[in-house]
């Protein structure tokens, strides 16, 4: 799979946030967006995900206009997206099933990612009982549980200590080795 964004622009009211942004990558590769706070990184991600449209430009998958309903995205948002008072395993299974996974596949993927991220002991806990770093790891499990082809990570190292930052780097390398777009 190849991904290309060409000439993306976005304005909010009279403020231009993006001007002519172009990106290109393919499966088995990582693409990073670096920039200052407010530079438009998250806006670019949200346009790619279809949260809102670009004012101009195009997004292509394998040379064709993107059809988001055919792309299995995994998205780790900058802000937390899970319910703090709910049991972790229940949330993860629910999210996987929303994305079309069978219960059996969802259970298998959940157990795999919880173990891989050293979080298996926490699956029956509520999210708000975990540290910020462990909450981030659970959010990553939610991102990966449906085996996405295209993984978008917004501020993925937020709240992670050096050991868990290395663990995340290892997981990203595994995703790349599996042919994912990261």
Regions found by a protein language model. Name each.
Residues 34-36:
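The feature captures the beta-strand-to-loop junction immediately N-terminal to the Walker
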Residues 49:
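Helix-to-loop junction immediately C-terminal to a conserved catalytic motif
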Residues 57-71:
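Conserved ABC transporter NBD signature motif
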Residues 93, 97, 105-122:
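Conserved ABC ATPase "signature" region
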Residues 126-130:
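Conserved ABC ATPase signature
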Residues 151-155:
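Catalytic Walker B motif of ABC-type/P-loop ATPase nucleotide-binding domains
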């Amino acid at each position: 799979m190849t991904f290309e964004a060409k000439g993306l622009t976005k304005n909010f009211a009279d403020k231009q946030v993006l001007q002519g942004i172009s990106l290109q990558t393919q499966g088995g590769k990582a693409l990073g967006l670096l920039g200052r706070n407010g530079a438009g990184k998250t806006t670019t991600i949200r346009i790619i995900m279809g949260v809102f449209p670009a004012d101009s430009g195009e997004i292509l998958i394998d040379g064709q206009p993107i059809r988001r309903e055919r792309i299995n995205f995994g998205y780790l948002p900058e802000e937390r997206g899970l319910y703090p008072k709910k049991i972790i395993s229940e949330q993860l299974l629910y999210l996987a099933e929303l994305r079309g996974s069978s219960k059996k596949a969802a259970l298998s993927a959940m157990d795999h990612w919880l173990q891989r991220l050293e979080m298996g002991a926490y699956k029956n806990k509520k999210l708000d009982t975990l540290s910020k770093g462990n909450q981030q790891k659970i959010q990553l499990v939610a991102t990966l549980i449906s085996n996405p082809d295209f993984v978008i990570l917004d501020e993925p190292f937020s709240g992670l200590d050096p050991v868990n930052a290395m663990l995340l780097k290892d997981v990203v390398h595994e995703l790349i080795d599996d042919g994912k777009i990261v």
